[in-house]
């Protein structure tokens, strides 16, 4: 399991790496292998610095790829973090699922 952090200075998109780099860098040696990680948006509560994940080459995205900046209010639903799973489809393709 890994942790990725980003401290944006405004709303913006963040592209994933390429599928080939995920396959080699995360040692996804067989189809179906996977890797889970948490993405934490470090944007300040009052600044609404949201991140939208976009797909790099060979990456298919499934689920909501919008990660809101954290909201520290008591009844808040925006934690500022998201959990993802990268799953190998082939040597040159992965699917990234938002799982939480």
Show the residue positions of the predicted features.
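Exposed extracellular interaction/assembly regions and N-terminal maturation sites
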Residues: 1-66, 74-76, 88-100
């Amino acid at each position: 399991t890994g942790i990725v952090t980003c401290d944006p200075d405004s709303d913006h998109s963040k592209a994933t790496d390429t599928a080939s780099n995920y396959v080699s860098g995360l040692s996804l040696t067989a189809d179906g292998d996977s890797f889970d990680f948490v993405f934490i948006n470090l944007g300040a509560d009052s600044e609404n610095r949201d991140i939208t994940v976009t797909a790099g080459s060979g990456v298919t995205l499934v689920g909501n790829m919008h990660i809101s900046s954290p909201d520290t209010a008591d009844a808040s639903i925006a934690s500022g973090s998201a959990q993802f799973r990268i799953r190998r489809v082939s040597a040159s393709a992965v699917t990234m699922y938002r799982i939480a």
